[in-house]
Amino acid sequence: MRGLIIRNTGSWYTVRTDGGQLFDCKVKGNFRLRGIRSTNPVAVGDWVEILPTTGELPPGGALPTALITEICDRRNYIIRRASNLSKQSHIIAANIDLACLVVTIAHPETSTTFIDRFLASAEAYRVPVLLIFNKVDLYDADEQRYLDGMMYLYRTLGYECLAVSAVTHQGMDALRVALAGKISLFSGNSGVGKSTLLNLLVPEARAKTAELSLAHDQGQHTTTFSELFDLPPLPSALQVPSSSPDSSSSPGTSDVQPPAAQSPISPGAIIDTPGIRGFGTFDFEREEVSHYFRELFQIGRECRFGNCTHTNEPGCAVKKALDNHEIAESRYLSYLSMLDDKDEGKYREKY
């Protein structure tokens, strides 16, 4: 029996079958031993084969139970290094059409290093990205100028950006259109307003929200597990004629099309994930890190040496472009930080 993982609460997974039936599932014991280097062998968004059982029930469980016996082929996924196990990865979500990163310029500030690490991981696993700049109603003139500069930088690199406010609803219609018909990952630091945005997009989600810490201007973890929520139909006033896949593709978009049986859930869905304070990249070889920074990869073709790391080598086109202000210093510093990953704590500045 085949189904979609729509919720992950640790060792238990909620699976929705093709027929709409829900099961509380665990991964079959010997399935865990197949050389999987992840803290979670399956993730929300995975299509799996399940075998109904009559055994152990999860705490407070009222659903029938089953064992997950097989993962169907993934068309993509996005991972980060497990926060406490540097040699293992954590699969954030699988089979997604769009990776949305909710960021804030202040209250709290999302570091450019965090943003760039997320973008690099999405590039590596061929997942299109939408940067959602939230809380625009709170910014003063200086912060607004910084926001404009950030959006200009990332749009110039080919990334789609939206400025939104969960309070005034600015940009929410544009966000609804961007998410329509797609399975979208929602990720971001704690405190950026991800849960509030989710409640506006999917009122039935009833995601918990919390006040920022007055001492640190950081958020508390209000989402403790990953869950998929179906989006409501797009209002008719926002519907536009669909374009062909070729005309709507963007840089970084995977050319791997989903199998018919794994097509996006109409009219779309959001995979909500717990807030994270750091984004450790996983399984990147040192010499390939620059491949996931679009501008560094393009300019790096002009370097004297094919294996240039853009640090101290002579004839480095990237260093020359940096000196000429042709690439952003923040992006280059993010690149350097990924070359020298040591601990998760440095990925986000302390307040």
Predicted region positions:
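A conserved segment at the C-terminal end of the G1
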Residues: T196-R206
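Canonical P-loop GTPase G-domain recognition
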Residues: Y139-S190
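Helix-rich effector regions associated with P-loop NTPase G domains
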Residues: S11, R37-T65, C72-I92, I96-L98, ...
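Phosphate-binding glycine-rich loops and their immediate beta-loop-alpha structural context
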Residues: Q88-L98, V102-L157
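Glycine-centered tight beta-turn/hairpin loop motif at sheet-sheet or coil-to-beta transitions
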Residues: D18-G20
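Beta-strand/loop nucleic-acid-binding surfaces
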Residues: L22-S38
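Structural detector for short beta-strands of small beta-barrel domains
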Residues: M1-T9
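Conserved "cap/hinge" positions at secondary-structure junctions
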Residues: P52-T54, V103, L201
